[in-house]
C-alpha cells in the first residue's frame, strides 16, 4: 500500500499518466489471432501509410482497426507526424454456442472476443 496523503498519491499517479494519443476497442467480435494479422501489418508505420494498408486489406478485422485508428488520430493534437508506437490485441471473453450435429450430438462453438488497443506517438 502506498504511503502518504491521498492527494499526494493522486498527484504522483497523474504525473505518471501516459499522454500519448490512443484508442481502445473492447469486446471486438474478432479473435486475437485474426486481429494480430492486421496489427502486425501496421505496427511502426506512419498513420497515412497504415490507413492505406487498412483500406485495401480484405480481412474483417481491418475495418474495425481502421475505425479505431481514426479515433486515435482524432485524439492527437498534431496529425502530420504521428506513427503507430504500440498496437496489440488482448484476449476477451468467449461466448459459448451449441451447434447441432448428426445423430443427436451437439458440438460447442466458441465465439472469441478481443480488446484492441492502438497508441500513437510523434516522430522526433
Language-model features and meaning:
Residues 27, 32, 97-100, 109-111:
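Generic structural "secondary-structure junction" signal
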Residues 102-124:
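C-terminal edge-of-domain segments
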Residues 38, 100-103:
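Short acidic (Asp/Glu) patches
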Amino acid at each position: 500500500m502506498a504511503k502518504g496523503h491521498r492527494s499526494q498519491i493522486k498527484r504522483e499517479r497523474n504525473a505518471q499518466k501516459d499522454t500519448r494519443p490512443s484508442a481502445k476497442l473492447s469486446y471486438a467480435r474478432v479473435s486475437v489471432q485474426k486481429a494480430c494479422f492486421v496489427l502486425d501489418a501496421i505496427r511502426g508505420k506512419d498513420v497515412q501509410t497504415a490507413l492505406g494498408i487498412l483500406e485495401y486489406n480484405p480481412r474483417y478485422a481491418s475495418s474495425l482497426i481502421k475505425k479505431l485508428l481514426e479515433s486515435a488520430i482524432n485524439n492527437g493534437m498534431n496529425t502530420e507526424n504521428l506513427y503507430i508506437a504500440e498496437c496489440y490485441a488482448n484476449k476477451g471473453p468467449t461466448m459459448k454456442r451449441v451447434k447441432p450435429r448428426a445423430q443427436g450430438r451437439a458440438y460447442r462453438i466458441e465465439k472469441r472476443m478481443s480488446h484492441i488497443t492502438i497508441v500513437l506517438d510523434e516522430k522526433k
